[in-house]
Amino acid sequence: MTNDSVPAKVMEIVAKQLEKDQKEVTPESSFANDLGADSLDTVELVMALEEEFGTEIPDEEAEKITTVQAAVDYIQNKMDDGKIKLEK
């Protein structure tokens, strides 16, 4: 997986976790306001991202990830820092 493929993968994970059609999920989508996620949904979503990308997202960082784009940015920044290495 490359840095460029992260947005599509994040949107796929969000759609699956929140049981939404992928067409409903955009980079600007807010998990709570646009996609109807509650706090438990958000925790499960962060866990799914951690599992997919092989990283740990600290709680203080997870609280800042409220949109699809915020999740993409977080993952891409970790990749740029060399903290996530993807071979998929």
Swiss-Prot record:
Keywords: Cytoplasm, Fatty acid biosynthesis, Fatty acid metabolism, Lipid biosynthesis, Lipid metabolism, Phosphopantetheine, Phosphoprotein
InterPro entries associated with the record: ACP, ACP-like_sf, PP-bd_ACP, Ppantetheine_attach_site
Protein name: Acyl carrier protein
Pathway: Lipid metabolism; fatty acid biosynthesis
PTM comment text: 4'-phosphopantetheine is transferred from CoA to a specific serine of apo-ACP by AcpS. This modification is essential for activity because fatty acids are bound in thioester linkage to the sulfhydryl of the prosthetic group.
Alphabetized Pfam families for the sequence: PP-binding
Keyword check for Lipid metabolism: yes
Single GO MF annotation: acyl carrier activity
One GO cellular component, as annotated: cytosol
Stretches assigned to the Carrier domain: 4-79
Subcellular location per the Swiss-Prot or TrEMBL entry: Cytoplasm
Organism: Trichodesmium erythraeum (strain IMS101)
Residues modified to O-(pantetheine 4'-phosphoryl)serine: S39
Any Gene Ontology biological process: lipid A biosynthetic process
Family: Belongs to the acyl carrier protein (ACP) family.
Gene: acpP
Domain of life: Bacteria
Function: Carrier of the growing fatty acid chain in fatty acid biosynthesis.
